[in-house]
């Protein structure tokens, strides 16, 4: 090996030992082996110590990263808590702020607005308002006695609402006497489609009321809450009532929730189910106590010759289930018709069909006031109430709902108003010309609700009113025109053209009315411009 080439010597040499050392004579000696083992042991110790050092450094780095991450989390938590505390402080400051709103001065009598020299709908209905002071319209807490009536030749009687007694559900309530009849104007369409007013002014006008009467629909709603508590008290001692009342309530809610847009035939079995439940309730098989229906209607009623139910009292379970039926209908309008307004129509058909049943009338008229009282609470703009959407009082007046003590979002509010506006139209624009039944809520109430909205002063127009008005018109313009002809066209022109034009702020809700007018022109050829 001594004569090997330098290349081979370089390739086979060890970093720590030379070839001569490897091939030395004592390479297999015990001392040589001990020496090599000691070198290997020292190398092993060095590698182990180096690995342990690296491992300790890695653990230290990981611990440092963990501590940094914990610190960042705590800093983020503190930052968020500081933001929440600041927001709560600002919110509390806003809640504590109260702005004193001075009372409004009486509005001046506006001059009749004209289009091409001809009076428009607001001028005509304003003439009616002077002759119909029966239902005061509140504006920001101020009572206004001007109320717009539907175009009809007949007069509407107004009665002082009955005051609920402490024992309203245990004894018959006392009826109040009727007030003098207030004649109203008769609105007739002219040949060119413009509304004109023909007034029937009495020789001696009744004196104006000195104070605003209480809101009867609010009283009815309060009485219905009392009835619900009264039924719960009865159920504690009447086991038959307790067992059946819950089943009947659930069946009515279920049937109303299953109403579809497939037509009357598709919903016939649901209507029949509701009718059979109410018929059973009217027969009072569960032996519920009797109540005075005058506590749940706007005007006290006297016996009517030939009426099916002329008794002064009705079974409380029947009135209670009418209330459940009305509540289920309102829930459908809010939860379903808000996103799909067309779903309000089958519910409106069912409401009109059930409440117009001759067996369910009391002293010649339906109990639809129970349903309308709920409309008054959840959608006050239909009854002439208005207010600012930016104030607590204004939102309350507009029917802006609260959940868990907090106002719902604007989108939720507008969806509710859309469903309720469509539901109101679905109930009030039902055709009974070919039916032997009595229409529980004639179209004149639709006209009145529309007039109360479009007669709003420009400064008080709200997005809520625009959303409700659009929902009332969309999908129901044909029915409206079918009832009132050219007068309805003039009313639609006022609602979709003139009313949004007077709004001081052109919001999306205001513009949607003008867009609806354009859609009607495109889809039906109805030109309101």
Swiss-Prot record:
One cellular component (GO) term of this entry: cytoplasm
GO molecular function annotation = inositol hexakisphosphate binding; phospholipid binding; translation initiation factor binding
| Predominant location category | nucleus
Query: What's a Pfam family in this record?
Result: GLE1
* Superkingdom of source: Eukaryota
Q: Report if keyword Transcription regulation is assigned.
A: no
Coiled-coil zones? 36-101
Q: According to its UniProt record, where is this protein located? A: Nucleus, Nuclear pore complex; Nucleus membrane
Keywords of this entry: Coiled coil, Membrane, mRNA transport, Nuclear pore complex, Nucleus, Protein transport, Translocation, Transport
| Membrane topology type | Peripheral membrane protein
* Motif interval(s): Nuclear localization signal: 227-234
Keyword flag Transport: yes
State any GO BP term from the record: poly(A)+ mRNA export from nucleus
Q: Which family does it belong to?
A: Belongs to the GLE1 family.
**What's this protein's function?**
Functions as a component of the nuclear pore complex (NPC). NPC components, collectively referred to as nucleoporins (NUPs), can play the role of both NPC structural components and of docking or interaction partners for transiently associated nuclear transport factors.
Q: How does it assemble?
A: Component of the nuclear pore complex (NPC). NPC constitutes the exclusive means of nucleocytoplasmic transport. NPCs allow the passive diffusion of ions and small molecules and the active, nuclear transport receptor-mediated bidirectional transport of macromolecules such as proteins, RNAs, ribonucleoparticles (RNPs), and ribosomal subunits across the nuclear envelope. Due to its 8-fold rotational symmetry, all subunits are present with 8 copies or multiples thereof.
State the protein's name. mRNA export factor GLE1
Native species: Chaetomium thermophilum (strain DSM 1495 / CBS 144.50 / IMI 039719)
């Amino acid at each position: 090996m001594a004569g090997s080439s330098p290349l081979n010597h370089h390739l086979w040499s060890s970093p720590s030992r030379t070839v001569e050392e490897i091939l030395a004579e004592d390479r297999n000696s015990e001392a040589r082996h001990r020496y090599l083992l000691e070198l290997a042991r020292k190398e092993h110790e060095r590698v182990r110590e180096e690995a342990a050092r690296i491992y300790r450094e890695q653990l230290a780095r990981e611990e440092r990263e963990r501590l940094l991450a914990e610190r960042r989390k705590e800093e983020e938590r503190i930052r968020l808590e500081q933001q929440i505390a600041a927001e709560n402080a600002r919110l509390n400051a806003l809640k504590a702020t109260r702005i004193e709103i001075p009372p409004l001065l009486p509005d001046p009598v506006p001059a009749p607005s004209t289009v091409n020299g001809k009076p428009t709908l607001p001028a005509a209905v304003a003439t009616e308002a002077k002759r119909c002071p029966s239902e005061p319209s509140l504006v920001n807490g101020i009572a206004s006695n001007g109320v717009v009536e539907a175009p009809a030749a007949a007069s509407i009687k107004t009665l002082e609402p009955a005051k609920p007694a402490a024992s309203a559900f245990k004894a018959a309530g006392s009826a109040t006497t009727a007030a003098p009849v207030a004649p109203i104007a008769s609105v007739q369409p002219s040949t060119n489609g413009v509304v004109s007013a023909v007034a029937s002014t009495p020789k001696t006008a009744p004196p104006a009321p000195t104070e605003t009467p209480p809101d009867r629909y609010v009283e009815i709603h309060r009485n219905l809450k009392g009835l619900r508590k009264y039924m719960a008290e009865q159920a504690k001692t009447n086991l038959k009532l307790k067992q059946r009342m819950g089943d009947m309530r659930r069946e009515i809610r279920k049937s109303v929730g299953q109403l579809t847009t497939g037509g009357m035939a598709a919903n016939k079995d649901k209507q029949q189910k509701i009718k059979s439940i109410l018929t059973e309730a009217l027969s009072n098989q569960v032996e519920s106590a009797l109540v005075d229906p005058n506590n749940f209607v706007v005007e006290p009623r006297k016996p009517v010759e030939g009426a099916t139910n002329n008794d002064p009292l009705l079974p409380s379970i029947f009135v209670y289930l009418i209330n459940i039926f009305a509540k289920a209908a309102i829930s459908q309008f809010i939860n379903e018709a808000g996103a799909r307004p067309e779903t309000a129509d089958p519910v409106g058909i069912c409401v009109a069909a059930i409440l117009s049943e001759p067996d369910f009338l009391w002293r010649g008229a339906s109990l639809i006031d129970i349903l309308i009282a709920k409309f008054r609470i959840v959608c006050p703009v239909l009854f002439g109430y208005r207010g600012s959407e930016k104030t607590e009082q204004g939102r309350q007046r507009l029917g802006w709902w609260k959940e868990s003590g907090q106002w719902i979002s604007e989108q939720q509010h507008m969806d509710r108003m859309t469903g309720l506006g469509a539901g109101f139209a679905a109930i009030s624009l039902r055709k009974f010309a070919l039916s032997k039944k009595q229409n529980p809520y004639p179209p004149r109430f639709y006209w009145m609700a529309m007039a109360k909205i479009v007669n709003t002063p420009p400064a008080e127009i709200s997005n809520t009113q625009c959303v409700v008005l659009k929902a009332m018109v969309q999908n129901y313009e044909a029915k409206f025109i079918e009832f009132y002809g050219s007068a309805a066209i003039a009313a639609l022109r006022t609602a979709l053209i003139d009313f949004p034009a007077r709004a001081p702020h052109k919001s999306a809700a205001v513009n949607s009315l003008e867009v609806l007018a354009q859609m009607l022109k495109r889809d039906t050829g109805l030109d309101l411009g």
